[in-house]
Amino acid sequence: MRIFIFFYFFLFNIYSQNINVNNSFIYENLRNSVLEGKIETDYTFNIRPINYNFIESQAGFKTLAKNKNSNFEIKSLGIDYFIEFNSNHPYNRNNGTMIPNRGYQHIISPGVYLKAGPLTIKFKPEHHYGVNTNFDGFWDGHYPEIWAKRYRLWNHIDLPERFGNIRHNQTKLGQSSIRINWKNYSIGVSNENIWWGPSLRNSIMLSNHAASFKHITFNTIKPIKTLIGNFEWQIITGKLENSGYNPPRTDYEYAGTKLFVPKINQRGIANDWRFLQGYIFSYSPKWIDGLSLGLIRWVQMYSDLIKGKYTWL
C-alpha cells in the first residue's frame, strides 16, 4: 500500500507581488473564476508567475509600514508551508524545491515585500527538509538491454532517481526577486520559478518540476493593449547548475560498454554550468476572445565555451 499526503498551509497572508508558480491550485481557481465570469482579466496564463494586481482587492496583505504618498511600503507575505509524505515510492511533480523522497519532507517559505518608488524587493526564501529514505528504484534484475534503454534517458537529462543517500536540510533563495518597474514593464534579477505555456500540469518550457534558478528578466507586468490586441512577453538570461547526483548503477555495462556517460562539455570538462537565454511572446487578437498565439525560443551552452567573451558572466 502506498500513501501520498500533500498539505499546503497559509499562515497570515497568501498573496505576494507575483502569485507563486508552486501555488497551482490558486491558478486553477483563477482560471475557473475567469471562465465563470467572476473575474475579468486580460491575462492569458501563458507566462507565470503573474502579477496579483487584477485580484488585489481579494488579497490579504498585512502592511507593516507605509508613507502618505504610498510610494514606500513594506508588506508581509505570510508563510507558505508545504508538507509531503510518501509511504513507499516518491512522487515528484509540480513541487519545486522538493525532491523524489520517500517519507516526510516539507518546505517553509516566509516572505516580505518592499516597494520604494519603482524599486520592488521580494524576499521569500525556501527552507527544505526531507528525510530521503531509501526506496526501491529501477529494478536491478532487469535484463541488460532494458538498462541500456533506460540509460538513453539518463544520459541525456539531469534527472536523478534519488538525490543522494542522506537527509536534506537546506535554505535557498526560493521565490525572491529585485525589480525596477515602470508602467507595464519590469526588469530585474530573480530566483522565482517560471512557467511558459498554456498547459496545466506540464508546461511547454520551464516549470516547477524542479527548483528555481537565478536569472535576469525583462517582462511585461500585465498585457500591453494595442489596436490589434494584447501582447505579453518575457526575456530571460540565467545560469543552470547540475544537480550533482548520478543515476543508479553507474558501473553497469552492456555489450562490453559502460552505460553511464558523464555529462561533459565539448572540451571534456564535467559538471560545467550552462548559460541560457530564452524568450516567450504571447499575442491575443482583439477580434477573437480567448485565443492566444505564442512563440517560445530557448538557447543554452556550456559556460566554458563562452568564457572570456562576456566579462559580466
Language-model segments: what does each one mean?
Residues D42, T120-K122, S186-G188, N230-Q234, ...:
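Residue-level detector of the transmembrane beta-barrel scaffold of outer-membrane proteins
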Residues G103-I108, N169-S176, N181, H209-I216, ...:
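Residues that define the transmembrane beta-barrel architecture of outer-membrane proteins
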Residues N67-S70, L114-P118, N181-N184, P223-W233, ...:
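Short loop/turn motifs that connect adjacent beta-strands in outer-membrane beta-barrel proteins
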Residues I14-Y104, S109, Y113-T120, P125, ...:
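N-terminal periplasmic/intermembrane-space "pro-region" immediately following the signal or transit peptide
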Residues P110-L114, S176-W182, V189, I216-K222, ...:
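Residues on the lipid-exposed face of transmembrane beta-strands in outer-membrane beta-barrel proteins
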Residues I83-F85, A116-P118, H127-V131, W182-N184, ...:
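Transmembrane beta-strands of outer-membrane beta-barrel pores
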Residues L159, F163, I194-W195, A210-L313:
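Signature for the C-terminal beta-barrel architecture of outer-membrane proteins
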Residues M1-V21:
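Bacterial Sec-dependent N-terminal signal peptides
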